[in-house]
């Protein structure tokens, strides 16, 4: 299931689009305020960001520009402003698309799916190149299997549903099994940005991943916390 953060201050529009996308296997978090959008996006680390332009606190163009320096996923502007100048500005700010709210829902869905597919393929290709894996090599740790081509994770013969962001985090940890990965390394490898000492999105994502992989929340033994250093994927904890 793909995850989306939709920054939209019109509650009716946000609800309608979120409900439509949910019917098509997309999990949508609606954030109504522009000045809280960046915090929500970095915390949720979604597969795609959908942005309105006219927002309270901070406009969508500025959010797009500021976010692009910290987050590498697809950003799509969804707006009622039918202006060539705004369209051009959005692309220059780092958006991958500019879609009008009058666009039929089915067309919106198709375009979002296109950007999600393109991002997944680009991320997978980058990961395979960096780890020098053959195209068909899955990783196996006891009862855990991670298939990078089909992007499928199974634990004790049960498929685990992971978002693209969660899969990439698991893949990054698993390909460095037994090694301590600090927040800076994880952020650089996954998003291309440095850790600023305040960003807690990695901690939130690790917590979410542990829950899905049935790790012990109180005393994690599969994805361990190494105090003041980072996180360690334990290769022998998956029996």
From Swiss-Prot:
GO terms for biological process: regulation of DNA-templated transcription. This is Transcriptional regulatory protein RstA. The gene is rstA. Member of the two-component regulatory system RstB/RstA. One of its GO terms (molecular function) is transcription cis-regulatory region binding. InterPro entries: CheY-like_superfamily, OmpR/PhoB-type_DNA-bd, Sig_transdc_resp-reg_C-effctor, Sig_transdc_resp-reg_receiver, WalR-like, WH-like_DNA-bd_sf. The keyword Cytoplasm applies. The modification 4-aspartylphosphate is found at residue 52.
């Amino acid at each position: 299931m793909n995850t989306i953060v939709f920054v939209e201050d019109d509650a009716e529009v946000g609800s309608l689009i979120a409900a439509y996308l949910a019917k098509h296997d997309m999990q949508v978090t609606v954030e109504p305020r522009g000045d809280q959008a960046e915090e929500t996006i970095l915390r949720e680390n979604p597969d795609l960001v959908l942005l309105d332009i006219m927002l309270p606190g901070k406009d969508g163009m500025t959010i797009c520009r500021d976010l692009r320096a910290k987050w590498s996923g697809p950003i799509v502007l969804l707006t009622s402003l039918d202006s060539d100048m705004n369209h051009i500005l959005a692309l220059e700010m780092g958006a991958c698309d500019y879609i009008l709210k009058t666009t039929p829902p089915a067309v919106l869905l198709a375009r979002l799916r296109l950007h999600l597919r393109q991002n997944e393929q680009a991320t997978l290709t980058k990961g395979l190149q960096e780890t020098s894996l053959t195209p068909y090599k899955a990783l196996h740790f006891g009862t855990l299997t991670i298939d990078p081509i089909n992007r499928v994770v199974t634990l004790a013969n049960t498929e685990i549903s992971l978002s693209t962001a969660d899969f990439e985090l698991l893949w990054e940890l698993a390909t460095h099994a037994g090694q301590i990965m600090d927040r800076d390394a994880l952020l650089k490898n996954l998003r291309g940005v440095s850790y600023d000492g305040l960003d807690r999105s990695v901690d939130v994502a690790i917590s979410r991943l542990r829950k899905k992989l049935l790790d012990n929340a109180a005393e994690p033994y599969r994805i361990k916390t190494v105090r003041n250093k980072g996180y360690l994927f334990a290769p022998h904890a998956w029996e």
